[in-house]
Amino acid sequence: MKYFILGSLASGFLLYGLSMLYGATGSMLLPEVLQSVMQHTAKRDILMLGLVFIVAGLAFKLGAAPFHMWLPDVYQGAPTSITLILAAAPKLAIFAVMLRLLVTGLLELAPQWQLMLMVLAVCSLLIGNLSAVMQSNAKRMLAWSTIGQNGFMLLAFVVSHANGNNLSLKDACAASMFYMLSYTIAALVSFGILMLLSREGYECENLSDLSGLNHHRPLYAGIMALSMLSLAGVPLTVGFYAKFKVLHALLTVPTTLHIALAVLAIVMSVVGAFAYLRIIKIMFFDAPEHTQPAALQAGYGVRATLTFNGALLLVFGILPAGLLQLCEQAIINMLRHMSGLG
């Protein structure tokens, strides 16, 4: 109910912003919107107010602070199978909308929406990572860490189209897309393990429920550990390279502000890593709390899928060029009609 009510409110914000966008430009076609803004024929005051509502609605849907209040409760309260979907599919959809709407349609307003996204990124990094380390519920911890991951991803948008440079736009958007895909894979793995454990007679909710998992199911413990290491950004995982690409994009414009943002992102990543490494410690070094652990009777397909996704975290971490090129090509195709890339 909370997700439905707040999600409806966010949709209202987004639709209200889009209606203002139409009122300011007279069109809902993104190329025409961009042309209207570039030619200064759009009504500026209405356009800026609409932009505020659009960014607020997108931030709410994404789960970026300070529009995050629904995320921990929904992740904890929903069945793990539903949480798995919420952690992946909506994030990819909202990311695609952000690319199309902000970058393709409102690129000329980049200084304005970049400032808004920078505030969202800083709030998400601070609130998400600091809150994650204090959680004892596994799904709630992953929810708070998701907020922190959203903040890291948004940092790439802060430097997109810096000084009108379309190459920096391509690199920044590709870095953010790569980051979102790497997070999605890790989230699918982590929530997939929790879902597998939860369906065997008890609900895997607390971190203590993972105690000693390595003793009776080392495969699942190993896959979960890979997911946590990737989310923490440990080298040789895709999460490390994703964070590196975002920081590299951020520092292509080495201003004092961008350097400060990079330092904040690194510090908050170290703080957030404590939450991820604590799960690994619980799985590998704590004794099982249950004298009779639930028998994990997973089919071959489930085991193969989890193993494949876990392997992707390593493969794309060691050989990231293929996935990164796909991201860059997707961005080039999106921007070709207005930037001449490719």
Regions found by a protein language model. Give the residues of each.
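Alpha-helical transmembrane segments of multi-pass membrane proteins predominantly involved
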Residues: 1-342
